[in-house]
């Protein structure tokens, strides 16, 4: 589970990636298929973003990463443009600015059931205007 967009691995020999990573104890599980957690740059770097994205993506990784199915995709986009591909994720999050009790809060719309490749499908709206804590509970309830 990582927060980066892409990782390229180059090698000289024909030793398998699993063997090479297994030799380094800290990387021993790196070759196993895991869930992908993607986040757009969010408000820190994007003028279109409505919410900060990386903190939530990191919380999802820390709190739910081991429970997410291998190959699943969780996508955190800071606005409806969906730069992190929320519309095709198993769990897609789209940032929205809203208010509760008269106070502006950062919130997310939760989309579920998206797919890529042979299982291509658009994710469907599941819940709206969730805080980060509510997002974690909503995803955990669906695992």
Language model feature labels by segment:
Residues 1-103:
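Small-residue-enriched alpha-helical segments and adjacent helix-cap loops
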Residues 87-143:
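Mobile "lid/hinge" segments at catalytic clefts and subdomain interfaces of large enzymes
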